[in-house]
Amino acid sequence: MPDYRSKTSTFGRNMAGARALWRATGMKDEDFKKPIIAVANSFTQFVPGHVHLKDLGQLVAREIEKAGGVAKEFDTIAVDDGIAMGHDGMLYSLPSREIIADSVEYMVNAHCADALVCISNCDKITPGMLMASLRLNIPVVFVSGGPMEAGKTKLSQHGLDLVDAMVIAADSSASDEKVEAYERSACPTCGSCSGMFTANSMNCLTEALGLSLPGNGTIVATHADRRELFLQAGRTIVDLCRRYYQEGDESVLPRAIASRAAFENAMTLDIAMGGSTNTILHLLAAAQEAEVDFDLHAIDALSRQVPQLCKVAPNTPKYHIEDVHRAGGIVAILGELARAGLLNTEVATVHSKTLGEAIEKWDVRVNRDQAVHTFFKAGPAGIPSQEAFSQSERWDSLDLDRAEGCIRDLEHAFSTEGGLAVLYGNIALDGCVVKTAGVDESILVFEGTAKIFESQDAAVKGILGDEVKPGDVVVIRYEGPKGGPGMQEMLYPTSYLKSKGLGKQCALLTDGRFSGGTSGLSIGHASPEAAAGGAIGLVEDGDKILIDIPNRSINLLVSDEELKARRLHQDHKGWKPAAPRARKVSTALKAYALLATSADKGAVRNKALLDE
């Protein structure tokens, strides 16, 4: 049987000093025989998705202690992408993922913790903690802060979210009063933004990976039912410790659970629910930490065979995450995928022997148990709040309509191909990604004229200044992991195109990335990026670009000879923006850029450079 890792600092005469320090944290004699479990919290008052987490780490800690473990809490940083958006703050968002992963590794390994509970929620925190847990490969359970309730206003016939506020603010025909009404209504409670944006997508994917409990991605942050998830996480992690350290059961380790098949399940779910394109970036990064052979080509293959079974904001204004929960949550989508033969149900989870057993227990179409149905009736209260577990409202009924409801069965899928696609061509030899769930059918094939911008700032200025016309392909380059640095999100450019009435008349191509709130023909992650010599850096104003989503291609309609000549010229000139950018890049960001790979590799560090 493996020894507790913590024995390194708690056992033997020579560890008297370390034990003295442990005692100063409150440990007693009997505690030195128990597993020490790290609780990685991410509380901050900067982020609505994390503002309510302050006491939840201790809630988990007390449950761990009741179950026979010793709990030690620490916090990671957390960046709010929405607040960091539209200025140089966004340069720090993606790099913060690596900082979070490293900080969890540092704390757990420095103190020889035996296991880990990850309390995450928003965009880079869940991926960062996921990368760390797979890197460490000790027992782990994820529990998130939960999604925000959708906003409401008398001026709108549907739920509101952050993107609605951004779009209307850029609409010159909207009155100041209307803009203010949206601003005050779009984000009414604590929690991760209410649509199928990056944060909620990732929290849902942890369910498919088998590392979190049912409901983790969908119970709203304010609902009392979410409290039980935190308590159950505390009990579960102690049980996983017992099975690994006392019984030698390696099947409970995260790399055993998050296998190649589990990653395929997670990506299948992502495609079926039209998740954020950022999830591709994060799953690729996590797979590398898990030492799983999972790449863009695998994602491309899945995207061609998985239908879209769920459609949520920003892909439709009709549904938000709270509606997914009412329809049976992530387990309901997994159940439909399993019945369609698109899921590996033999993979393990932290809460069930197999995913198949979990579906049998939690899928509302399979299990008619009243307790299960009551669980999925947990809904929003419509009361502004920054407190966790502050309400206990329930829907009168579930959404079990698999023909026209929020979640569909295979026969009634929103589309036969899923909500994400990988495109290849001479402008992106290593691939790029598009959220097809947000693309109007009329522009699935689009030939347009390149309009070049050397930064997001320049693109925003150009769009608002009416430089972009119908039929243009807005190209924003040198915004990749290395070139930005930091691979900024392009939510403002896409929102402004939408507000200008160009959402169905233009395309946007970038080596940067997009917010989960993005819709329209928005193609990101172009790889290699411009700063790494990618062909996106060779496009010139007026070039024709052909985008063909059904055939998964994107090409610059320029001869190979012309591209070769342009490349020779650019090699001589250097792969840098043609127009100077007023951008201050700190030493920390320069260090990130030095090691960053392009998006097709997950924008992780280039380990080959470290080996040198």
Curated annotation (Swiss-Prot):
The entry's keywords: 2Fe-2S, Amino-acid biosynthesis, Branched-chain amino acid biosynthesis, Iron, Iron-sulfur, Lyase, Magnesium, Metal-binding
Cofactor note as given: Binds 1 [2Fe-2S] cluster per subunit. This cluster acts as a Lewis acid cofactor.
Binding site for Mg(2+): 81, 123-124, 489
Protein function: Functions in the biosynthesis of branched-chain amino acids. Catalyzes the dehydration of (2R,3R)-2,3-dihydroxy-3-methylpentanoate (2,3-dihydroxy-3-methylvalerate) into 2-oxo-3-methylpentanoate (2-oxo-3-methylvalerate) and of (2R)-2,3-dihydroxy-3-methylbutanoate (2,3-dihydroxyisovalerate) into 2-oxo-3-methylbutanoate (2-oxoisovalerate), the penultimate precursor to L-isoleucine and L-valine, respectively.
PANTHER family: D-XYLONATE DEHYDRATASE, D-XYLONATE DEHYDRATASE YAGF-RELATED
Subunit: Homodimer.
Name the UniProt record assigns to this protein: Dihydroxy-acid dehydratase
Record lineage: Bacteria, Pseudomonadati, Pseudomonadota, Gammaproteobacteria, Pseudomonadales
